[in-house]
Amino acid sequence: MPSRAAVLIDRLALAPHMEGGHFRRIHTAKAAPGQRPALSAIHFLLAAGERSEWHRVDAEEAWHFVEGDPLELLVYHPGSDYPGSDRLERLRLGPLGEPDSDVQPIRMVPAGAWQTSRPLGAYALCTCLVAPAFEFAGFTLLDDDALAARLRELAPGTGA
């Protein structure tokens, strides 16, 4: 019997994403010719052992949990040129749990922030809204040795 993640990949017609995991764009707002649409939405699934590689997007991103296990979302804020002014947020996305739990069903990533994610169980299915709409021209995978070293220091084992 196929895993629930495999069933969802098939049922939602998800394709491999260059950052890792599987996705399908499900909506793009209408826009005037030559204008960037205001919003886009995708389904995004990460199965056990998969991760979204460190990347950034030039637009705000809202992650909405749909089903599965919680997802760890790491968001790196570079800060200024002063050593130690940068910071790493460790967010957990998932169903509302106990009152003292840090798991939330919606998490935000600011435009330009570096991010990576991984499921904390068998799989996590999310919907990601991007405003203004996602464009691959505004997507950057991590390709900076100094930044990768800093991310490994802040978050060991995250593939930086």
Task: Locate the predicted segments by residue.
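Non-catalytic, conserved peripheral segments adjacent to functional cores
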Residues: M1-M108, T116-S117, G121-A124, L129-A160
